[in-house]
């Protein structure tokens, strides 16, 4: 009970609530109070101050908002003073006003001082009711007896400068309006935007005729003349620009736009035809094949490209008296002739029996494998046409020396009249079925070569 009685007695001795009521009755709506929770939190008082001009708002060129944060120990403790939203005042003037109000608060410590602080701020604004700074349009300071105007957002301009700015902005807005009408003929009309303040972009309320009637400012027109330091900096920047341009550091917008531009007016230059190799006549020289393996490989690559994939098979010859003799020498590879287009769709070739050698395809090799030059003496190229029985068997074919190279064999067509049927087979008989994977035709995207075996080896 004693504690509550002391608290009640302290609230009665606190003068802040009664002083705030007096201030609200004097300044009415100009004063805003944020009350705390009794004496446990400070109160805040906001008021916007203007010069005393007998309610002539057009003559009020400066203003600011005074914020007083009253502590719980007021009036025995000085309130915290801050100035917000100053208009027409320089930083130096704002600092001087803050110091003057602090001196007033310290002088009235222990008594009610809020009213004195507010009136001191108004007095300072009345004494400094001249906008400080420069016209943001012409960047010249304000002089006495000059015609200048104040916007509702408390920004200041010379009347002549503001009139020229308004005329320019009106022409710009009209041009933008015509462009919008052409682009959006069927779109909903947008709300027109008037001339805005060049500082804060607030809408301006103006009388263009009265602004144009104001006298022009008597400021001297100073011509710009660069000094030696400015000229030196210009030369340095010029050299830097040229250096960046030489190294590709400057982006040319026009060149970038036409970077991927393709002109259809000029026809493209005709391409030079590549040297075609006559495969049918065997134009590659045997001497080059024997002496320069690298050239032979390049020629074989060109032949492999020009031939169809299905016809790029290799033929392996084993010289000897018969198929039962061991293989002699190195394997010689040659490219078989392609199928002619006049024979229609391709069919699986029948197995033919050769005398004196066998023709097999290398398993596991690609169609475009590289031709390997023989290490030993070159062998005679294989002739797929078997010898006639009328001539009689004269033993195995004789190998020719390196100097007896006769060139590649003449190209032959697959004429069935030159092939003989096996002696132990009749026209009605069929060949025995081979095991899976040995010469059987398998339809697929890649055509497997057919292996040819001798008569005794079948």
Swiss-Prot record:
PTM comment, free text: Ubiquitinated; autoubiquitinated.
Highest taxon of source: Eukaryota
Molecular function as annotated in GO: NF-kappaB binding; ubiquitin protein ligase activity; ubiquitin-protein transferase activity; zinc ion binding
Residue ranges occupied by any RWD domain in the UniProt entry: 18-128
Stretches for region Disordered: 267-299, 317-458
Residues annotated as binding Zn(2+) 2: 153, 155, 197, 200
BP-aspect Gene Ontology terms: positive regulation of NF-kappaB transcription factor activity; protein ubiquitination; rescue of stalled ribosome; ubiquitin-dependent protein catabolic process
Record-linked Pfam families: RWD
EC number(s) from the headed UniProt entry: 2.3.2.27
Zn finger (RING-type) start-end: 135-201
Comp. bias regions, Low complexity: 432-443
GO CC terms: cytosol; nucleus
Subcellular localization: Cytoplasm
UniProt record similarity statement: Belongs to the RNF25 family.
Subunit structure: Interacts with UBE2D2, and may also interact with UBE2E1 and UBE2E3. Interacts with RELA/p65.
Protein's recorded name: E3 ubiquitin-protein ligase RNF25
Taxonomic source organism: Bos taurus
Gene: RNF25
């Amino acid at each position: 009970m004693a504690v509550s009685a002391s608290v009640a007695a302290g609230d009665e001795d606190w003068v802040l609530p009664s002083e705030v009521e007096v201030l609200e009755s004097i300044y009415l709506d100009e004063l805003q109070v944020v009350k705390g929770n009794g004496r446990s939190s400070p109160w805040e008082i906001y008021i916007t101050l203007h010069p005393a001009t007998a309610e002539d708002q057009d003559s009020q060129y400066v203003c600011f908002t005074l914020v007083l944060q009253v502590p719980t120990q007021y009036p025995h403790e000085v309130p915290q003073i801050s100035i917000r939203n100053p208009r027409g005042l320089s930083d130096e003037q704002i600092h001087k006003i803050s110091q003057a109000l602090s001196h007033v608060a310290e002088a009235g410590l222990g008594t009610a001082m809020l009213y004195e602080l507010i009136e001191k701020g108004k007095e300072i604004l009345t004494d400094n009711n001249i906008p400080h700074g420069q016209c943001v349009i012409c960047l010249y300071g304000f002089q006495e007896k000059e015609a200048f105007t104040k916007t509702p957002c408390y920004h200041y301009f010379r009347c002549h400068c503001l009139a020229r700015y308004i005329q320019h902005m009106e022409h710009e807005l009209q041009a933008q309006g015509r462009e919008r009408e052409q682009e959006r003929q069927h779109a909903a009309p947008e709300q027109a935007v008037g001339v805005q303040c060049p500082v804060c972009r607030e809408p301006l309320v103006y009388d263009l005729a009265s602004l144009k009637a104001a006298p022009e400012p008597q400021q001297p027109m100073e011509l710009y003349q660069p000094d030696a330091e400015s000229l030196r900096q210009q030369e340095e920047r010029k050299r830097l620009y040229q250096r960046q341009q030489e190294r590709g550091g400057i982006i040319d917008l026009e060149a970038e736009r036409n970077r991927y531009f393709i002109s259809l007016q000029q026809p493209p230059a005709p391409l030079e035809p590549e040297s075609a190799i006559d495969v049918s006549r065997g134009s590659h020289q045997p001497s080059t094949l024997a002496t320069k393996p690298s050239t032979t490989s390049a020629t074989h690559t060109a032949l492999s490209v020009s031939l169809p994939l299905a016809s790029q098979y290799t033929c392996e010859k084993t010289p000897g008296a018969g198929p039962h003799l061991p293989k002699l020498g190195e394997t010689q590879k040659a490219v078989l002739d392609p199928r002619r287009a006049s024979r229609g769709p391709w069919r699986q070739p029948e197995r033919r029996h050769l005398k004196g050698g066998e023709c097999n395809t290398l398993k596991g090799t690609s169609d475009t494998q590289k031709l390997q030059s023989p290490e030993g003496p070159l062998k005679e190229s294989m002739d797929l046409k078997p010898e006639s029985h009328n001539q009689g068997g004269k033993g195995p074919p004789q190998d020719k020396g390196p100097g007896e190279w006769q060139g590649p064999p003449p190209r032959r067509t697959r004429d069935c009249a030159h092939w003989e049927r096996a002696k132990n087979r009749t026209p009605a008989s069929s060949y025995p079925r081979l095991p899976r994977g040995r010469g059987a035709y398998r339809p697929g995207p890649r055509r497997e070569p057919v292996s040819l075996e001798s008569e005794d080896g079948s």
